[in-house]
Design a protein with these regions (language model features):
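An edge-strand/N-cap motif at the start of beta-rich repeat modules
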Residues: 7-33, 38-42, 272
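A short beta-strand motif characteristic of beta-propeller blades
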Residues: 15-22, 59-65, 102-109, 144-150, ...
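Beta-rich, blade/repeat-based domains predominating
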Residues: 22-35, 67-79, 111-123, 151-165, ...
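Conserved beta-strand positions in repeat-built beta-propeller and related beta-rich domains
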Residues: 42-46, 85-91, 129-133, 167-175, ...
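Short loop/turn segments that connect beta-strands within beta-propeller blades
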Residues: 54-58, 97-101, 140-144, 181-185, ...
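A generic tandem-repeat structural signature
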Residues: 61-123, 128-134
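Blade-level signature of beta-propeller repeat domains, shared across WD40, Kelch, NHL, RCC1
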Residues: 248-278
């Protein structure tokens, strides 16, 4: 079993159910909190848009993209207020400037990707995109492809590792999570055999390096600590609705002690509070 980072885990974590939003989305996937914490942006796949939720009530208060997106799967937002959206069924990533709840389309990327379902704006300036239909990850620099990793199977999420350089990739069709270098070299593998993944999708990272992954077809959220152990699993492996129950969950976003999850099969977002055990 592989170590996730060199940062020690200080304490185990528990998660307490807080609130479930209304079922007003359609197969929500990954989500992202705005840099100022005021808005929760959700990839609303079935509605071909990015839905904007109040982070507390989890009600939809706005949206953008429904007039030109198709099958929206992922969103990332950089510190400058630009949003990068996996416009999956159009086989492109759309780029926007964001001002509160207003989005302006300013560009797109589509070279050598089909059906993108994951996007990451890296601190190194590159934009990394996972092509779920083309089974690859490409790195764009100044709008041009500079690197490519082939031989994947329906790759999904891309998340920045805690060291600020590495990239975690959900290689969904192979039921594994990979740690990549910025040059797309595979450094580590979290395998199906070790973690019983079945369609691992979107992820986020705690400050200590703990990886939180939505294991879609197991209807679970798995916490994998830096020492490779799995101290917490939310969900009993069966589809459901209610505290600690999910149906094909996809999206994960964490900020401080708050954890938001896309309970995709139930068409809603749920919120949990993270607690550390002494």
């Amino acid at each position: 079993m592989f170590l996730l980072t060199t940062v020690p885990l200080q304490a185990d974590v528990t998660a307490t159910f807080v609130h479930a939003g209304p079922a007003e989305l359609s197969n929500p996937h990954d989500l992202k909190l705005s840099p100022d914490g005021r808005y929760l942006f959700v990839s609303d796949v079935g509605n071909n848009r990015v839905a904007i939720l109040d982070p507390d009530s989890l009600k939809v208060i706005g949206s953008f993209g429904s007039d030109h997106q198709s099958g929206t799967h992922d969103i990332d937002i950089d510190s400058a207020g630009r949003a990068y959206v996996a416009d999956t069924h159009n086989s492109r990533v759309t780029i926007y400037t964001i001002d509160a709840m207003h989005a302006k389309l300013i560009g797109e990327l589509s070279t050598r990707i089909r059906g993108p379902e994951g996007v990451l704006k890296h601190p190194n300036g590159r934009i990394y995109v996972a092509g779920a239909w083309s089974n690859n990850v490409v790195a764009y620099e100044n709008g041009k492809v500079v690197m490519e990793l082939k031989g994947l199977s329906a790759p999904h999420d891309l998340e920045l590792a805690v060291d600020g350089e590495g990239i975690w990739l959900a290689d969904a069709g192979n039921d594994r999570v990979l740690l990549l270098s910025p040059d797309l070299v595979i450094k580590r593998e979290l395998s199906r055999e070790s973690y019983r993944f079945d369609g691992v999708r979107y992820m986020d990272i705690l400050a200590d390096g703990t990886l939180i992954a939505a294991d879609k077809n197991n209807h679970q959220i798995k916490f994998i600590s830096p020492d490779g152990s799995m101290p917490l699993v939310l969900g009993d492996g069966q589809p459901g609705r209610g505290p600690g129950k999910f149906t094909t969950p996809e999206g994960v976003e964490v900020s401080g002690k708050t954890l938001w999850l896309s309970d995709s099969g139930n068409n809603r977002v749920v919120r949990y509070r993270l607690n550390r055990l002494p």
